Structure formats: structure tokens, C-alpha cells
Amino acid sequence: VSDRYAVVGNPVGHSKSPLIHAAFARQTGQDIAYDRLLAPLDAFAVTAQRFFHEGGHGLNVTVPFKREAWDLVDECEGGALSAEAVNTIKRVGNQLIGYNTDGKGLLADLERNLGATITGKRVLLMGAGGASYGVLQPLLERKPDLLIVANRTLDKAERLVRHFHKDASGVPQGVAARPYDNLGGQPFDLVVNATSAGLEGAMPPLPENLFAPGAIAYDMVYGLETRFLAFARANGVRCTDGLGMLVEQAAESFFIWRGLRPDTAPVIAQLRSDH
């Protein structure tokens, strides 16, 4: 019998995770079954526990359950601790271990696939929701010259910044929260959209001179030409969606579960050509 894995979310029908993990399994000769698991909005824990009780080996967790997954697991590793969000669960004996592979996925896509450098650069992170919690710490570990978190409601951005800078002085080094209408006058080398604004279409008020020469505009949403990417393209900026991040965070999950690192490039290329 194949080892069972699944992605759990609501909605989950659109998820590309089963395709990605099937490709990884073929590539590495692993015998796994990977399904979609729709959890009722009020029954994530029950759904996940049943899956593991019935012999499931691991889960990927997507919107809107990453925070609940953090509450569910018995212990957290690495990025999941700081993010207070879990997107990968591994069953070890009767313990559930939680991980967050979003930050590693973003960095792998930016650095390996896109050849971007973050160290010493000026970075803008748009949004202060769960997606930002998952990637802020890994971005900061690359030591950018400046990292600004922008959000419609400033106090949410300030809360995010404080969450990751609980040092004695209480003064974050090189990271600050700003409202969108206070971003002018300093172009950024990397702008990451971690809001769902890409989906709804409404875009925050961004200044014309947002992008430095050679900048990269990165939208975590994939498969859609978002308003943000259209804005960046109109400014002549190099643009990319979140498909690479999706595949890279999946590869990190696969490594956690199976101990093997799949080759992501052919899988990204396959998904791009399918779209």
C-alpha cells in the first residue's frame, strides 16, 4: 500500500499540490499516494486527526488552516515557530510535527530560479497577513539593507514587525512598517506581494517610482495576471508569479517527508507549459 499524503484546505479543488508531488514521486521512485482533502471551515482539526488516525503519513496545509495547524501539532520545527503557522505536518510515531516551508520556498525561487540577491538590497513586503508571517523571518536572515512591511491597516504591519523583533532594545534594525501612501522617494530592489489583492483586483496606492533599476516584482499568487504584476510590467520591471515558490515549498515538504530532494526545474516548466 502506498504511503498516504494529502493537501488539506477550503477550497482545495484548485490545488496543484497533487500534480507536483506525483511528479516528485515519479522522479525519485517513491511509492506515495497524494490526494486533496476538503475540510469544513469549522472542522480542520477533526479532519486532520482522522487522516492521521487512518494511517496518513503527512499533510500539506493551505488557506485558511495554517494557524489552526500550528495549534494542532505536538511540536514545531524552525520556521513554523516564528511564523505561528504550519503548512507541512509529518507524523512521527504518534506525534505530529509541524513545519513551515513557505519562506524556504520563496527564497529558493528568488535565489536559485531567478538569480536574485537579497543581501544588502531594499525589500518591500506588501501585506501583513499569514503569508507575510511565513516569509518575513527568512527574508530578514538574508540581511537586506532595508525591509519595509506595507499594509492598508498600519497597526497590522507594526504588529508583524514587532513579532519578529522582540530584542531587548525593542527597536527593529533595518525593518519598518509603513502605510502604502508613505512609500515614495525610495525605490526598492525587490517588491513581494503577499496580499490577496491580486485575487480581488483592487490594488493599494503605489507610487510611480516604486522600483529601482533592475528590480524584481514578485507576486505570491500564481496562474493569474494580477493588478500588481500588470502595474510592475507597465513600469518595465521584471515580473514573476508565485508558481516557483509553490513548487519549491512543495519540494521542501517532500524532503521533510521522504528525505530526498527532487529536481524542481522540470516540474515548474511542466506546470508553466500546462497553463
Language model segments and positions:
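Glycine-rich adenosine-cofactor-binding loop
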Residues: 9, 98-103, 110, 114, ...
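Short glycine-/small-residue-rich Rossmann-like dinucleotide-binding loops
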Residues: 63-64, 193-198, 221-222
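Rossmann-fold NAD(P) dinucleotide-binding segment
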Residues: 68, 199-217
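NAD(P)-binding Rossmann-fold cofactor-contacting core
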Residues: 142-167
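Rossmann-like NAD(P)-binding element
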Residues: 153, 182-204
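Short acidic low-complexity segments
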Residues: 168-188
